[in-house]
Amino acid sequence: MNYQMITTNDELASLCEVTRDFPAIALDTEFVRTRTYYPQLGLIQMYDGKHVSLIDPLGITDWTPMRDLLLDTAVTKYLHAGSEDLEVFLNTFGIMPQPLIDTQILAAFSGRPLSWGFAAMVEEYTGLTLDKSESRTDWLARPLTERQLEYAAADVFYLLPIAGQLMKEAEASGWLSAALDECRMTQLRRQEVVDPKEAWRDISNAWQLRTRQLACLQLLADWRLRKARERDLAVNFVVREEHLWAVARYMPGSLGELDSIGLSGSEIRFHGKTLLALVAKAQALPEEALPEPLLNLMDMPGYRKAFKDIKALVQAVATESKLSAELLASRRQINQLLNWHWKLKPQNGMTEMMAGWRGELMADRLNTLLEGYPR
C-alpha cells in the first residue's frame, strides 16, 4: 500500500491545501494512554480517495492548516468508532472535526452490531482479513516500523470507500438523518468536561457515605481531578479511587492512619499531608455546608420494575422500527433516564432517551410509563 509521510510544517500545509479540494476524507489517530490523563498523539492517518497520508505529530509545531481542514464544512470527515479519536482532536487542536460521520454508527442503523469492529467491517465489504497485531503498539516510539505504518495506512485506505456504501445503505433504510443525529450526540458527549466540584459523584460507593464523609469526598475528588489534569496523570496514578473513598470514609488524622487504611507508600509520601489537610477542612465545615445524602439509583423503590418496563418498551420500539434494542437504549442511558426522572443527579439538558431521534420514537411513551414511577 502506498502512503506518504508528513513530518514537517511545510509538508502539512501543502497536504491540507490539496486535501480541501476533496469532498470527503477518512481519518484515524494512533495514540498512547497508559499513565496520562490526556491521550498522547502518536500518528494521524488521512485518506482523500487518492493519497494515504501518515502525519507524524512529533516534528510538527504549526497545526493551523490541520485545524482549518478539520473545520472546513465542505469536506466530510469519516471515522470508525471515533469516540476516542474525538478526544484526541479536542485535546490536541481544541476543536471537533466538522462535519463528522462515524461509520460504526452508520453501520448500526443498517443492522450491524453496535460495537462492530473495523476489521469485521472490512472483511464483510472486501473479503480481506486485516492484520490487527499492531493495535497495542507504542505509537510514540521512533522510528515507527514498516509494519506499523502499513497497519496505520490500512485503517483509512479501506474506510473511505466503505463509508460511501454505508451512507447509501442508511439513506435507503430511511435512517440516515437519525444516524447523523447520533454522530452529533457522540460529539456533544465527548465535549462534556467534568467539573472538579462534581467529580465526587462518580466515585464508586459514594452513596454509602454519611454527609460529612461526602463533604470530605467532595474535597478529595476535586483536588485529585485538578491534580491529574495539572500533571497530565491518570487519576488513579494520583490516588487510587478505592483509597480516596477510604480516606473519606475513615477521615484519618495522621500519616500512620493513612497507612493503616491501605494507602500506598508513594501516595502517602507525595500526597499524605494534602490529604490530611483536606480531611481537617471537611471536619471543620458547619452542618449547613454539608451536601445532601446521595441516593443510590438501584436502591430506589421501584427501580428494578421501572428498568424492566423501560427495557420492554425499548424492545417493542426496536421491533417496530427494525433497529436493535442495544442501539435504542443502553443500560447507561436507561439509568440516566431514571436518574433524571427521580432527580438523583444533576444533568445537563435533556436526557438522551428523550432527545433527538430517540425522543421522536419513544419520548411520549416513556413519559406515560414514568408517570407510574413517582419519586
Where are these regions (language model features)?
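Short, contiguous strand/loop micro-motifs
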Residues: N2-Y3, S53, L106, Q208, ...
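Conserved DEDDh/DEDDy metal-dependent 3′-5′ exonuclease domain
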Residues: Y3-A13, E17-L27, V32-E169
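Accessory DNA-binding and partner-docking regions appended to nucleic-acid-acting proteins
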Residues: E146, L166-R375
